[in-house]
């Protein structure tokens, strides 16, 4: 065993800071994540740089703000020349692995929604130290490694490694029960017609009215969270007899919408057990323009509520989304428990730093809104962060 510590880095997608047992959620139980906090340090005011996915993930990897690394919003891949902390760890002798979601490149066919602002000719070039931000590599790319066309029907070309400093990748793209990447190929090996289990058109019956609530037909043991658990445990098995330290990022696509907790996790939590946030009721106060617009869209039946953008909800819809989100987080917590147990089986728990965080949050009823958008509300930019050092 190496005298250098290992790092096991758990990250979820679209996970508010207050949706953990250890952060005081009144209903949700997360005993395994809580156990990390109990032996480490939980940061109560941990804020991300942006209220959506790609800018924050690029900031996490580079330590630089979106205005510097260039991923200003979703649809802009992080430069393959960007120097990441995993590149530094790899160069220093750590084995590096990504199991799950990356989202450092585009995983939809949609590009940037806004052009990059023109460079002011009066600005000076970057000063000393800028060379640390980029890698001295020839060429640039490839940038199609998370493209859905690359992974269609379980057929894919090998990934170009290292991938932003990761020398081992088990990739998941997308969300809910329609996750792609290596997961799609794995699922095809389980079922002759796995596509018949995925998506709203194949869901099981239910009476929920919340937009994007899908009772998936995929069994728990074949849901993306279970795949990530399996691959993370396989990676720990591979590292057990290794003298090199490792850094493993275990990245869950949940609890990002659509709301698709499988099996027992679907109704593990009840809408009637949830409590609307105080900001759901605005009373007689006038709404700011963006909130008023969202309410008007809902009341007119004109709201687009099937995509990625913020939309308004009524009380019942918010409570259902909150309950389903708790179910998705509960499954992630169970997977984390299994992975931590695997770490202990191999005797690596005494030499492994364990971290838990997320890329951004979700309104989940704040101000009668759902999902995320270009607004720096606490529900979107405040995320969990737990660091448990080696004993």
Residue ranges of predicted features:
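Formylglycine-dependent sulfatase
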Residues: 1-391
């Amino acid at each position: 065993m190496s005298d250098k510590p290992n790092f096991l880095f758990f990250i979820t997608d679209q996970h508010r800071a207050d949706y953990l047992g250890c952060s005081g959620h009144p209903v949700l139980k997360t005993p395994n994540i809580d156990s990390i906090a109990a032996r480490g340090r939980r940061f109560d005011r941990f804020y991300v740089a942006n209220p959506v996915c790609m800018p924050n993930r690029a900031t996490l990897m580079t330590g630089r703000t979106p205005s510097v690394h260039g991923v200003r919003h979703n649809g802009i891949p992080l430069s393959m020349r960007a120097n990441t902390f995993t590149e530094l760890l790899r160069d220093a002798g750590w084995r590096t692995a990504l199991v799950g979601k990356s989202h450092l490149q585009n995983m939809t066919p949609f590009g940037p929604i806004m052009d990059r602002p023109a460079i002011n000719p009066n600005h000076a070039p970057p000063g000393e130290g800028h060379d640390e931000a980029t890698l001295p590599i020839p060429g640039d790319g490839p940038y199609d490694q998370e493209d859905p066309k690359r992974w269609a029907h379980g057929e894919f070309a090998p990934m170009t490694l290292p991938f932003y400093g990761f020398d081992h990748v088990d990739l998941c793209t997308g969300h809910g029960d329609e996750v792609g990447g290596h997961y799609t190929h794995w699922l095809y090996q389980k079922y002759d017609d796995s596509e018949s289990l995925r998506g709203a058109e194949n869901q099981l019956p239910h009476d929920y009215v919340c937009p994007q609530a899908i009772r998936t037909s995929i069994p728990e043991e074949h849901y993306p969270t279970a795949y990530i658990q399996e691959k993370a445990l396989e990676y720990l098995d591979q590292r057990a007899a290794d003298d090199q330290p490792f850094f493993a990022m275990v990245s869950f696509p949940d609890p990002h919408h659509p709301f698709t907790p499988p099996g027992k996790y679907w109704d593990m939590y009840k809408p009637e057990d949830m409590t609307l946030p105080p900001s759901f009721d605005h009373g007689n106060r006038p709404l700011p323009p963006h909130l008023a617009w969202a309410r008007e869209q809902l009341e007119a039946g004109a709201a687009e509520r099937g995509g990625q953008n913020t939309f308004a909800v009524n009380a019942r819809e918010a409570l259902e989304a909150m309950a389903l989100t708790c179910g998705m987080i509960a499954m992630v917590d169970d997977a984390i428990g299994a992975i931590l147990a695997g770490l202990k089986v191999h005797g690596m728990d005494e030499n492994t730093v364990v971290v838990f965080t997320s890329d951004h949050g979700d309104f989940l009823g704040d101000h009668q809104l759902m999902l995320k958008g270009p607004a720096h509300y606490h529900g979107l930019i405040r995320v969990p962060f737990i660091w448990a050092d080696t004993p």
